[in-house]
Amino acid sequence: MSETVVESFTLDHTKVKAPYVRVIETQAGPNGGSITNYDLRLTQPNETSIETGGLHTLEHLFAGLVRDEIDGIIDMSPFGCRTGFHVISWVNYDSETLAKVFKKVLEKIVSDEVTEVPAAEIESCGNYKDHSLHSAKEWAKIILAQGISSDAFERKIV
């Protein structure tokens, strides 16, 4: 058993109120610079989760659409529990800024502007058969209807 303390394992998942964005941590690099890890929680932990096709499609859509809105995004990786994403950035944004960005991106996803899943071919995706644009759009609608909070424990909808 590892002795390393993993922040997400110390988070009381029964106390958070999804959807939200929160800063998990900012780490300084050994040669300067820093990266920040965010918790983009889209569904309430232990109550519901996004099926893999919808989550996988959101991942592909976020990859381009979020980077179109802000600089410094290194990676967006889905949580294994399928309730949201880690968002890694070399820019230290506050939670409210990122919540507004994800609201805007989700609004684009539900619009008629998004009609296909980017990079959903065998050459560009490791599981190209597991996508659902319909599911991604439906989840985006649900998340927008609930509102995205800039605080994990108190609803501060942006």
From Swiss-Prot:
Its EC number is 4.4.1.21. It is an enzyme of class 4 (lyase). GO terms for molecular function: iron ion binding; S-ribosylhomocysteine lyase activity. It catalyses: S-(5-deoxy-D-ribos-5-yl)-L-homocysteine = (S)-4,5-dihydroxypentane-2,3-dione + L-homocysteine. Fe cation binds at residues 56, 60, 125. Binds 1 Fe cation per subunit. Its cofactor is Fe cation. It comes from the Bacteria. Keywords: Autoinducer synthesis, Iron, Lyase, Metal-binding, Quorum sensing. Homodimer. Belongs to the LuxS family. This is S-ribosylhomocysteine lyase. It comes from Leuconostoc mesenteroides subsp. mesenteroides (strain ATCC 8293 / DSM 20343 / BCRC 11652 / CCM 1803 / JCM 6124 / NCDO 523 / NBRC 100496 / NCIMB 8023 / NCTC 12954 / NRRL B-1118 / 37Y). The gene is luxS.
